[in-house]
Amino acid sequence: MRELVLNCREAQADALSDALLEAGVLSVSVEDADLGTEAERPLFGEPGTEPQVQAWERNCVVALLPGGADPAQILEQAIAAAGLDPALAHGWSLREVPDADWVRLTQSQFGPIPISERLWIVPSWHRDDPAVPGLAPDAARDAIHIELDPGLAFGTGSHPTTHLCLAWLEAELPAGARLLDYGCGSGILAIAARKLGAGETVAVDIDPQAVQSTVDNAEVNQVRLQAMLPDALPAGEFQVVVANILSNPLKVLAPMLAGRVAPGGHLVLSGVLERQADEVAAAYAPWLTMSVWRERDGWVCLHGVKA
């Protein structure tokens, strides 16, 4: 297969993309034309903040062509349909897309993840052979396995913040604790908590797809928990509240999350960069004294006990 690649201005990118799809290309993506250079301009921001850059000045439009398609003809047709300058048709290029078994290639990028010698995250395609270099085969087979495949919801165990929260649960979770996982994503933390001995476990997310993902993953792992949207969260306090989201939402949610922690209970927060730790901890200061429990690759896990 081949891709048609063309640089254009910000104002042209959307119209050209739509016209290319109408002309029959299989897919279109828009990238920063300066990607990988000093002029690259990241477009992102945490929830509650506006990205510093709203759009790239120079865009690279990449269109996947169907077999046998004439790229020049498709491009000219799209430019005309979008009412753009015909001169835009100059300067395009083609690049080959190698044939590949994309399912197998994707699976090869996700192997078993050891959180500790005891706790492992295992994709379904490694279900019968969770071998990882550095540990004896019998140690791997005796570990607690959480079966989880990458999907729409965040949380596969590979990100430092997920790893930090899992490590806390593995090391510190009180037996039988009532636990709230707020911002559950894939449900990985709630599922791990149940397998590690938590009692009643409630998983909450604002995204219905994440809630369904948690339900599905809990069924695969044969654990019982409740998964729901925030409005359905039952009343009451929890011995453990864990939230692996981002610093701005954590600050906004501080009164609610702190209020859900029972006296003597634990609050575990991640999704926080080292430079954000003091600010997030300060947001919880009226209710708990937070401290850094552990750091990993520039991210921290904050922990506090409610008096």
From Swiss-Prot:
Coiled coil: none annotated. It is an enzyme of class 2 (transferase). The keyword RNA-binding does not apply. InterPro entries: Ribosomal_L11_MeTrfase_PrmA, Ribosomal_PrmA_MeTrfase, SAM-dependent_MTases_sf. Its EC number is 2.1.1.-. Keywords: Cytoplasm, Methyltransferase, S-adenosyl-L-methionine, Transferase. It catalyses: L-lysyl-[protein] + 3 S-adenosyl-L-methionine = N(6),N(6),N(6)-trimethyl-L-lysyl-[protein] + 3 S-adenosyl-L-homocysteine + 3 H(+). GO terms for molecular function: protein-lysine N-methyltransferase activity. One of its GO terms (biological process) is methylation. It is found in: Cytoplasm. It comes from the Bacteria. GO terms for cellular component: cytosol. S-adenosyl-L-methionine binds at residues 162, 183, 205, 244. Signal peptide: none annotated. Gene3D superfamilies: Vaccinia Virus protein VP39 (3.40.50.150). Belongs to the methyltransferase superfamily. PrmA family. Methylates ribosomal protein L11. This is Ribosomal protein L11 methyltransferase. It comes from Bordetella parapertussis (strain 12822 / ATCC BAA-587 / NCTC 13253). The lineage of its organism: Bacteria, Pseudomonadati, Pseudomonadota, Betaproteobacteria, Burkholderiales.
